Every structure is written in structure tokens, then in C-alpha cells.
Amino acid sequence: TENINEKIYSEKIDVFEDSRNTQKENAKYAKIDDFPIVNQMPELPTGCEITALTMVLQYYGFPAEKTDLAYNYLPIASASFYYDEENRLCGPDLNEYFVGDPGTVGGYICGTEAICKAANDYLKAQGSSLHAIDISGVSFDELYQFIENKTPVVVWVMLEMAIRGGTKGWYTQLGEYVEWSTNDHGAVLIGYDEEAVTIADPICGEIQYSMQQFETVFSSRGNKCVILKD
């Protein structure tokens, strides 16, 4: 486990260094043009994260289909809950799985681990050397540098970039508390300038939000994000 963790950490550093080394200093604008837009509706009303990944895979030239990814690659756990000996509500890990059915309005959400697994299993099946990397915790400077490098970033945000409201949650079998909010959303960051960001949204399409609004919401979701890298 130690070696694996060291490799992942080293890989993250390499990603950031690769991004820094190819940047123009003080760049104020960058956008990925002709980015494919895929709408999650009507097939996947709660499948925003996997639809965001579908867009990124299509950007890299893969024949990815959202429903194929959702039902053949995305780790899914049934929405089964119970109370433990301490009377705590317990259920599946929202980070590792999509909880529920993304094809219904009753589905919940999933985290970066689930999206990375779906991406990596798909990429392996395609015989690709690309792989997904969880870069959660990235700084905003580093985040925007990926866009300058024409690397789209799957980001965990909120629907319509609204401030995150009240959350609900439960404990996993390992005792970790996981939470979700009704309007939790996944999308793709594809551009930015001094005042705004451009988002490829699985519901709204290509849309701009103020940079301050985006950064506030992105931070409220823990700076969670994923990229694909060779």
C-alpha cells in the first residue's frame, strides 16, 4: 500500500509539473474549443458525473456513450441502508460507488473514486494508454493551467452553480461519514478568463459562470476533480 500511495503522490506531482512547464506566464484566458456536449437527460436524470466523464472521453476521440458507461463501467451500489449498534444510519460509500440508479430521479451521487474506476476500466477495454487521475485538492492556479494545456477537468460542483444547501448523509461500513445535497452536480471545466469560467454542463450545455461563484462552489465540494492523462 505504501508503494502504491507513493506512486499516486508522485504521479500527481508529475501532472502538476507537466502543466507548469508548458504554460505561458500570467495567462488570462484559455478555452477548449469544439468540446463535445452530452446531455444527461432524459436517460440519466441523476447521472451527471458519468455524463461529464462521457464528454471528456469523447473529447479524446473515444466512442463513449453515457448509458454504456453508466451501466457497464460505473460502480453502482443499491440504496440500501441500516442502523448500526450506535443507531447511526449506514449505507454504501458515496466516494466509491454511485448509490442508487442514475437512470432514475431517486439516484444519489458518486465521487471521484467511482468516476476514476469507470474511466480506467473503459480506457483499458479500449486499449488506451490514457488513465484517470484524481487531482482533488488542486489549487485554482493549477486547475486553470490544465485548461491552458487543453486538458478538460471533471469538476464536482452544484446545479446552476448555486451555493450548496443543507446536506444529508450516513456512515460507511468503515465508519466514514459521507454526505450529499439535492443539487450536487458534476460537470466539466473547459475555459476561463479573468472574470468567468466556461463549463460543459450535462444539463445546461456550455455555460459561463463568474469565477468567484465557481470557486466558492467548487471549494464547497472539496475541490474534487479528475483528469485523463497519458
Model regions: which residues?
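Loop/turn elements at helix/coil->beta-strand transitions in domains of secreted/extracellular proteins
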Residues: 126-130, 148-154, 193-195, 223
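Mid-length scaffold segments of soluble, non-membrane domains
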Residues: 100-141, 145-149
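Cysteine-dependent hydrolase recognition
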Residues: 64-86, 126-133, 216-217, 223-230
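A mature extracytoplasmic/lumenal domain signature
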Residues: 52, 136, 157-161, 191-193, ...
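Extracytoplasmic/secreted cell-surface and envelope-processing proteins
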Residues: 140-142, 163-167, 207-210
